[in-house]
Each structure stands twice: as structure tokens, then as C-alpha cells.
């Protein structure tokens, strides 16, 4: 087990290093400059490039960035908040992005499990077809479309919740963004729960339990549902990270000061350091969660660990 965990950690670190290198190359190829909007002469721009080390070869900048990153230094902002440490900017905004993601995950998990269980227990009925149709629609509709519909009908027409984020009422301001983000995970969890629960209900040991005269609700709650939810739980980690990493447009729509909106501002203003740092933080969160899921899979099912170690 220790060998398996060590190998997964090394692979994750190598993946992060490759991602960081790709981000550097992409930022280097991007047109424009963080100093384009300023009324500066070419000589002044050259001085700024030299000040921030942007005149150095990409390899030198990459190695210096990695060295500084190991000490927690992600550089400073060039355009959004000049000379302000990016690590501080991210730490101020990361919490609200995580909160929105967790709220969306809670909503998606509750309604996804309900839809999936109801669908599986009424397999091949009109209820199953209705739940499946709702799941397909949920997967198909982008979160930003849901956000715009919620803004118009719930916030503008019914005036139940504010459209834009308000620090005085943070919780109510995050309800609509969380609901918009929860549509896709609701559908995915519902489909996954339905599939797993149907497989479990058709398994031999469930048929054996039924033959012993165990009541249906006890059989479902104590045996079928418990076994069906093990694979579902393992996919919730990546779904949560996807919610946080995919909330950039939602944060812009609702004016939420999260890391997603910060990354979009960095792209719009050619703030290389901000864009790289935000993208890297998202990547690190996703890979860390996938690492945890891999380890959990290895603990839950040793066959997975053995097969990966053999490779």
C-alpha cells in the first residue's frame, strides 16, 4: 500500500509540473502585454519587462517561478492590482469559491440521490423515464444558461434572491449561483446512482436476501443502497473540484469575488502571473482530489491497487 501511495504522489507531482510548464508556454504565446493599456513609451515598457523578469528566456522564468512557488511566492500582479502578492489575492478569494462549490455539491447530492433512487426503484416505468429525462436535460444545459434563467425568473421577476453578490447578505447571495452550479452534478449523481442501484438490486445476494423474507425497505436501506453508494461517494470528490473550477463564468454573472472571476480578469488584462497562479491552483486542487480518490479506490478495492502496481 505504501508503494502504491508513493507512486501515485510522484505521478501527481510530475503531472503538476507538466501543467505548470504548459501554462507558461501558453502564456508566452498569448498576444498582447500586461502593459498595453498604459500610456508608456517603448523604453518604459522595456524597463517594466526587465523589472519583472519578462525579458528573460522562458526556461529561466519557469525555473525561477518553480523555485519561488516552493516558498509560497506566486509572484505579483502586473495589471489587476499592481505589485500586490498573488498568493494574498488568491487566499482572499478562494474561500468563497469553495463555499459556492460545497453548497452546490450539497444541493446536487441530495437531489441527485433522490432522483437516482426513485428512478432505480421504479425501473422501466414512467417514473424512471421521467427521472432519466430530467437527468439528460440537466447534463445537457450549461450552468451559465441556468444562471441566466434563475437571474431572470427568480431574482428579477419574483425578487426572491439578489442577482449580484452582496457582502451584507452573503448566504442569500450565493443561493442562486449554487443552484445554477448544482444542476449538472444533480444529473450526474442521479444517473450514476440509478445505474449502480439497479446493478445491486439484480445481484445474487440481494435475491438471496429477498428469498429469506426480509422486508423491502430494510433490504434497500441496509443492503442495496449501502453497496450502491460506495462507487457514488468516490466520484463526489472530482465533482466537487469540477464545481469550483467550473464556476468562473457563474462568478462573473453574479459578481462573486471568487478565484474564478479573478482568473477571467487575469486573462482579459493579460496578467500572466494571475492567470498562471489561478490555473495552477485549480489544477492542484483537482489532482489532489483525484489522488485521494485513487487511494480510496485502492483501500476499498485492493484489485485496483494490484492492477495499477503491476502496470
What is each of the regions a protein language model found here?
Residues 6-15:
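N-terminal signal-anchor/signal peptide hydrophobic helix marking the start
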Residues 9, 44, 48, 58-74, ...:
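Hydrophobic alpha-helical segments of integral membrane proteins
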Residues 23-29, 65-67, 133-162, 180-185:
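Membrane-water interface segments at the C-terminal ends of transmembrane alpha-helices
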Amino acid at each position: 500500500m505504501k508503494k502504491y501511495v508513493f507512486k501515485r504522489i510522484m505521478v501527481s507531482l510530475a503531472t503538476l509540473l507538466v501543467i505548470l510548464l504548459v501554462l507558461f508556454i501558453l502564456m508566452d504565446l498569448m498576444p498582447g502585454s500586461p502593459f498595453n493599456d498604459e500610456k508608456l513609451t517603448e523604453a518604459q515598457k522595456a524597463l517594466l519587462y526587465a523589472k519583472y523578469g519578462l525579458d528573460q528566456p522562458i526556461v529561466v522564468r519557469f525555473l525561477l517561478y518553480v523555485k519561488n512557488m516552493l516558498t509560497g511566492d506566486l509572484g505579483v500582479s502586473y495589471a489587476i492590482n499592481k505589485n500586490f502578492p498573488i498568493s494574498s489575492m488568491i487566499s482572499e478569494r478562494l474561500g468563497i469559491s469553495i463555499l459556492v462549490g460545497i453548497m452546490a455539491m450539497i444541493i446536487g447530492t441530495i437531489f441527485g440521490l433522490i432522483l437516482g433512487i426513485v428512478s432505480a426503484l421504479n425501473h422501466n416505468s414512467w417514473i424512471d423515464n421521467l427521472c432519466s429525462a430530467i437527468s439528460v436535460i440537466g447534463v445537457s444545459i450549461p450552468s451559465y444558461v441556468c444562471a441566466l434563467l434563475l437571474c431572470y425568473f427568480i431574482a428579477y421577476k419574483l425578487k426572491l434572491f439578489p442577482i449580484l453578490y452582496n457582502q451584507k447578505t452573503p448566504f442569500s447571495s450565493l443561493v442562486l449561483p449554487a443552484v445554477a452550479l448544482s444542476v449538472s452534478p444533480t444529473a450526474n449523481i442521479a444517473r450514476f446512482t440509478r445505474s449502480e442501484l439497479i446493478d445491486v438490486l439484480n445481484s445474487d445476494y440481494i435475491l438471496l436476501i429477498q428469498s429469506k423474507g426480509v422486508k423491502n425497505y430494510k433490504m434497500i436501506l441496509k443492503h442495496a443502497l449501502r453497496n450502491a453508494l460506495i462507487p457514488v461517494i468516490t466520484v463526489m470528490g472530482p465533482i466537487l473540484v469540477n464545481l469550483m473550477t467550473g464556476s468562473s463564468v457563474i462568478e462573473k454573472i453574479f459578481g462573486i469575488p471568487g478565484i474564478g472571476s479573478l482568473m477571467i480578469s487575469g486573462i482579459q488584462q493579460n496578467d500572466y502571473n494571475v492567470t498562471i497562479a489561478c490555473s495552477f491552483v485549480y489544477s492542484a486542487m483537482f489532482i489532489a482530489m483525484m489522488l485521494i480518490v485513487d487511494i480510496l479506490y485502492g483501500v476499498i478495492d485492493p484489485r485496483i491497487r494490484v492492477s495499477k502496481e503491476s502496470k
